[in-house]
Amino acid sequence: MTVRVEIRETPGDQEAVLALAEAAAEADGVRPLNEQTLLALRYGGPSGARFLLLYDGDELAGFAYLEPSDPPSGELVVHPGFRGRGLGGRLLAAVLDTGGKGVRLWAHGDLPAAARLAAGFGMTRARALWRMRRPLTTPLPAPELPEGVRLRTFEPGRDEEAWLALNARAFADHPEQGSWTLEDLKRRQQEPWFDPAGFFLAERAGTLVGFHWTKVHAQAEGADGPIGEVYVVGVDPEERGTGLGRALTLAGLAHLRSRGLDQVMLYVDEANTAAVRLYESLGFTRWTVDVMYRR
């Protein structure tokens, strides 16, 4: 069979890619593609994004996606039925050649095979993202808002611009989140899971100063049934140290429990020790790890 890598500006056969990803998830116990990649498959990526499809003959054997960040970042996956033949290396070589110097790639689940592949190309571990979880069947402290702050929920058609401005302030040091555009937000508003009743905003004198956006998964790998998610918590830099982040987190957890959920998860950067300490103080424990490799 002839092996080739096609590099495209559009995703191509979305259904074949999703089927490949599902086969990998069943084999590895962890989903290989994150939300950003799945949205790019559905709607198309931003200008400069690249979709790499590895074919063995006419069969799709691997897939990779590169975001045009600085430096580029993305992820790749090889179908379980095509592993052990050097195709992962073939695809990774194409990714590195396409992305250029400093390419960053996520490996979900910290699997040994991914670590070996990365090491073989001189890539080193650059970041670790923890997935943490806690039961919602145990007691939750009541949220205590700072004086002068009130909570309400997100109103579509009214709050988008103010929320984007707050998100940029809150995540000025984390461009993956802080650089969100109106299009990024609207795409998520179109997703079946979006529920403004679970999108909490904190206001002080009419100005947004914090938020907690929750999410509900019908199913997640490793979870027995539906699970809630602390999707994003953000606090204005001027409000840090006031306890607002803790109060927002607790308000969202209470909402998820009111939905009948008995477990909740979140993602947090291993290096964000303040956030890790907060979540551990609220009963979260480490569940799985995603690793970013960089050359």
Swiss-Prot record:
Domain N-acetyltransferase: 5-141, 149-295
Residues binding acetyl-CoA 2: 233-235, 240-246, 272-277
Protein EC: 2.3.1.189
Binding, 1D-myo-inositol 2-(L-cysteinylamino)-2-deoxy-alpha-D-glucopyranoside: E35, E176, K215, E229, Y267
Annotated keywords: Acyltransferase, Repeat, Transferase
Claim: Repeat is one of the keywords in the record: yes
GO BP, one annotated term: mycothiol biosynthetic process
InterPro entries for this protein: Acyl_CoA_acyltransferase, Bact_Acetyltransf, GNAT_dom, Mycothiol_AcTrfase
Enzyme class: transferase
Protein name: Mycothiol acetyltransferase
The organism of origin for this protein: Thermobispora bispora (strain ATCC 19993 / DSM 43833 / CBS 139.67 / JCM 10125 / KCTC 9307 / NBRC 14880 / R51)
